[in-house]
Amino acid sequence: MEASVHIGNSVPHAHLHSAAPARPADPVRPDGSRRALRIGLGGPVGSGKTATVAALCRALRDRLSIAVVTNDIYTREDADFLLRHAILPAERILAVETGACPHTAIRDDISANLEAVEQLEATVGPLDLILVESGGDNLTATFSKGLVDAQIFVIDVAGGDDIPRKGGPGITTADLLVINKTDLAPHVGSDLQAMAADAKRQRGERPVAFTSLTADNGVGPVADWVGARLTAWTAA
């Protein structure tokens, strides 16, 4: 059992965590209605996860009821960024301080994140979508199916155009791979066509989205994918 700290808005409290459930989370609320779709966003430090979360919220918040859970090891920096830029009202953003390797809190011991998700459902709901952002991690980071229903993995061209070729569970198994900061490709010498080809070899038919969040509607391909997942989720 591992102790860590969970921040709900700004009130910290300690938890003793148990192992993550192996089976997918129940899609139905206690009242029989379908709960919010939960999508996890993972990726290396600096790849643009928080910026992607912010852009998704801006693109979708006028038509969907959204909440966010962020993960940081010792701070609530990502949550503070979202609050500072008025991405969502404060009550729709919860921060988890993992106190350990970021992947532990999203895959091996999800209890703090699961509590945050369930707290949002209970206090802010009904919600359509909850985004769970992992702390920055390496290419092996994946989410437990007991926490999220789908996973987005974010990399960026500044990390090198060989990243898709290197693979790793984040690259190969995520439901959507996002290759971010395409506007920087000419400046860092990254070959977008090579990245696309390598991603295709690693992922087969799983989708890949190229994004530049500095462009108008730069998050559009990701927002469209989320919208399609939500349509399928609510129709199930």
From Swiss-Prot:
Family matches, as Gene3D superfamilies: P-loop containing nucleotide triphosphate hydrolases
Q: Name one GO biological process term.
A: urea catabolic process
Q: Which UniProt keywords apply?
A: Chaperone, Cytoplasm, GTP-binding, Nickel insertion, Nucleotide-binding
Q: Where in the cell is it found?
A: Cytoplasm
- Name the major location: cytoplasm
Q: Does the keyword Nucleotide-binding apply?
A: yes
UniProt key word GTP-binding = yes
Q: Which residues bind GTP?
A: 43-50
UniProt xrefs under Pfam families: cobW
Alphabetically, the GO molecular function entries are: GTP binding; GTPase activity; nickel cation binding
Q: Which family does it belong to?
A: Belongs to the SIMIBI class G3E GTPase family. UreG subfamily.
- Quote the subunit structure annotation: Homodimer. UreD, UreF and UreG form a complex that acts as a GTP-hydrolysis-dependent molecular chaperone, activating the urease apoprotein by helping to assemble the nickel containing metallocenter of UreC. The UreE protein probably delivers the nickel.
Q: What does this protein do?
A: Facilitates the functional incorporation of the urease nickel metallocenter. This process requires GTP hydrolysis, probably effectuated by UreG.
Q: What is this protein called?
A: Urease accessory protein UreG 2
Q: Which organism is it from?
A: Saccharopolyspora erythraea (strain ATCC 11635 / DSM 40517 / JCM 4748 / NBRC 13426 / NCIMB 8594 / NRRL 2338)
